Design a protein with these regions (language model features):
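C-terminal catalytic/acceptor-binding lobe
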Residues: 2-7, 14-22, 172-174, 178-295
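Hydrophobic beta-strand segments of well-ordered beta-sheets in folded domains
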Residues: 4-10, 33-39, 58-61, 85, ...
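Short, well-formed alpha-helical segments that are part of the catalytic scaffolds
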Residues: 7-34, 44-53
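Short, solvent-exposed loop/turn segments at secondary-structure junctions
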Residues: 13-15, 67-68, 91-93, 135-139, ...
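Well-ordered, non-membrane alpha-helical segments in soluble/globular domains
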Residues: 20-26, 103-120, 222-231
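Active-site-proximal specificity loops/subdomain of glycosyltransferases
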Residues: 39-88, 93-107
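A structural signal for short, well-ordered beta-strand segments and their strand-loop junctions
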Residues: 84-89, 128-133, 191-195, 242-245
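Conserved catalytic core of nucleotide-sugar-dependent glycosyltransferases
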Residues: 95-186
């Protein structure tokens, strides 16, 4: 396996019986299971997943560590630096897309083409990482190009990048998406986002899965723990201070999270810090050259 042969690394926890019907099914639907490495928390979990996936194709099941951040660290340590890795979580039920004509496909089968295009594009233009917008409402997608390089949240449950532990691993699981994203803002200027596609997930709606690997207890305990974690990150990470707002509680649940500043504020911070201010848009589907570019 060469560094340019991408692998798919999935973090999963206590979902041996459900996993075959979630991310595994989605990958099988897209003929991608031959690249799949599954990272579980312990040896007992490994046996359960082997039993649940008996007779089904996959590359390997590896005992990593419990917890989102720890599992990501185990993935980065398992593969060589520079390896093309697609990081996925265990709750990706379906891959959906829109065609250039706006036709919606709920359970698409062309994820491989996006992955290959993503790795080729970030390597060709030195863009660092790619993800999807996860937006399925056309109203919010009006005027968006096929793909775009800009500051954007690098979703922890699906992103592709060359293995670089210093960029990818985080101390804490909470807000790891934001911590990882701002590193790419600082080093590359943003991330590559495919606007017209994403994944159906049921995060927080079902028992088990990777989400359960960092259970925070009751609503009051969750509020306390996420507030403490968010404050620690904000107070100790200068990149978070530069590109994100102070921690705030979510309106609809007992979570304290970190959200990014507005795009103009992020661009201003990049200029002040001497970070690259880069942008590109690919308006047409599958064009190899950007329609607009400041790279």
């Amino acid at each position: 396996m060469g560094l340019d042969d991408y692998v798919i690394a999935c973090r999963s926890y206590k979902w041996a019986n459900v996993f075959p019907h979630k991310t595994y099914r989605m990958l099988a639907h897209n003929a991608l299971t031959d690249r799949l490495y599954i990272f579980v928390a312990n040896q007992e979990e490994k046996h359960l997943y082997e039993h649940a996936l008996h007779g089904l194709p996959y590359k390997q099941i590896i005992v990593g560590e419990k917890g989102g951040a720890n599992a990501t660290r185990a993935i980065c340590h398992f593969f060589p630096v520079g390896q093309r890795i697609l990081f996925v979580d265990d709750d990706l039920a379906r891959f959906f897309t829109f065609s250039e004509k706006g036709e919606y496909t709920k359970d698409a089968k062309n994820l491989r083409r996006y992955i290959e295009d993503g790795f080729e594009t970030i390597d060709k233009y030195n863009l660092g990482a790619f993800t999807f917008s996860f937006l399925s409402n056309k109203f919010y997608l009006q005027g968006k190009p096929f793909k775009e390089f800009r500051p954007f949240m690098l979703a922890g449950n699906f992103f592709g990048a060359r293995n670089n532990p210093a960029m990818i691993t985080t101390k804490l699981s909470h807000n790891d998406d934001a911590v990882r994203s701002v590193r790419y803002f600082e080093h590359y200027g943003g991330v590559l986002v495919y606007w017209w596609g994403g994944f159906e997930t049921h995060y927080g709606q079902e028992e088990g899965g990777l989400q359960a690997s960092g259970s925070r207890g009751s609503a009051a305990e969750t509020l306390h723990k996420t507030k403490a974690a968010s404050n620690e990150i904000y107070e100790t990470d200068p990149l978070i201070q530069a590109y994100a707002k102070p921690p705030q509680q979510e309106k609809t649940n007992p979570f304290v999270t970190i959200k990014f500043k507005t795009l103009p504020q992020i661009r201003k911070a990049q200029k002040e810090r001497g970070a690259p201010v880069r942008h590109a848009r690919w308006s047409k589907w599958w064009n190899t050259k950007p329609t607009e570019a400041e790279l």
